[in-house]
């Protein structure tokens, strides 16, 4: 599903690939070390606001095909837009969190049924920060953002 960059939430899921890491200026000696990469990505998030607490979890993985990447579950004390989060992480693929704590924890750790792609989980940190998704009533804000971007009510 495609989400508007103006979509507002307090919780997001991001997939960070090497291209995104390079967009952020993270050098290979950092991003090739799963523990350093996870710490760097979570530091970027936690330091991105001086007024609210931002926490998260990170799993660094390698796909069966050899694609090295990281999954992030990100939480903010205030709402922010999907576009802001994606930009903060080098234009990484970002979506709002829609599932609960158990489902997202299982996804991050690639437990069944999320192990179907045969990814190797190289490092995980921050699982205690994963929260249950709590719906918000920002639907009108999200609809307004879509209309502002030129979408019609039927779309």
Language-model segments: residues:
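A generic structural motif
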Residues: 68-76
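Short, glycine- and small/hydrophobic-rich beta-strand elements in well-ordered beta-sheets
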Residues: 50-65
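Short coil/turn motifs at beta-sheet boundaries
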Residues: 7, 65-67
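Catalytic "initiation/cleavage/transfer" segments centered on a nucleophilic residue
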Residues: 1-47, 77-155
């Amino acid at each position: 599903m495609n989400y508007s960059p103006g979509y507002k939430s307090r919780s997001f899921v991001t997939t960070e690939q090497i291209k995104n890491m390079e967009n952020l200026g993270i050098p290979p000696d950092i991003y090739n070390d799963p523990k350093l990469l996870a710490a760097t990505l979570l530091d970027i998030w936690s330091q991105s606001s001086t007024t609210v607490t931002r926490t998260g979890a990170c799993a660094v993985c390698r796909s069966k095909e050899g694609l090295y990447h990281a999954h992030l579950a990100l939480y903010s004390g205030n709402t922010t837009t999907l576009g802001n989060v994606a930009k903060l992480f080098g234009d990484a693929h970002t979506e709002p969190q829609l599932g609960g704590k158990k489902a997202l924890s299982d996804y991050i750790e690639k437990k069944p049924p999320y192990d179907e792609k045969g990814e190797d989980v190289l490092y995980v940190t921050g699982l205690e920060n994963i929260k249950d998704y709590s719906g918000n009533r920002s639907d009108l804000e999200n609809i307004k953002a879509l209309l502002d971007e030129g979408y019609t009510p039927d779309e």
